[in-house]
């Protein structure tokens, strides 16, 4: 059992989640926790779905606490079963929220270490080969302001840690970024 005291290991995952998300449950000790019946219901449904290895579609409005309602049962299930979980989000901002805010809380609650990684789509990464090619042909491809932007991307590229668009301190125009971002046919 990964969840600490107060969680009976004989309970189903759904029941453990109902308890964890209750007004006096495991999450109640967290300073950010606010009891939400919808969140509790969702966490229980996710737990039940994982136990049954069945599909689940959930729709919930803003402020329900969806992230924790799917993260905690999935991480618990993964640690207990030795299986992996993948969380796909619509935005990189939500991915980063999961990684920087929600998963640290889940890690603390889990009481056992687990690994998490942020994976972004290929178009979010600069392609060194395409960047070099664009620089060589910038006079033919870009206006003077776009060429300046390309040079700013080059300067950033020389110091970036991960080569992702979100690592930039400016937002390049779509035209320039499309000429230097990673593509399956060209970049490896």
Predicted regions span which residues?
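Short, surface-exposed connector motifs at secondary-structure boundaries
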Residues: 52-56, 80-86
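A substrate-engagement module of RecA-like helicase motors
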Residues: 2-29, 82-188
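Walker A/P-loop NTP-binding motif
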Residues: 47-48, 68-81, 101-105
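Alpha-helix initiation/capping motif
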Residues: 36, 65-67, 127, 164
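Alpha-helix capping and helix-loop boundary segments enriched in small/acidic/polar residues
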Residues: 33-37, 58-65, 90-94
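Walker A/P-loop
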Residues: 51-73
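Conserved pre-motif I regulatory segment
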Residues: 6-58
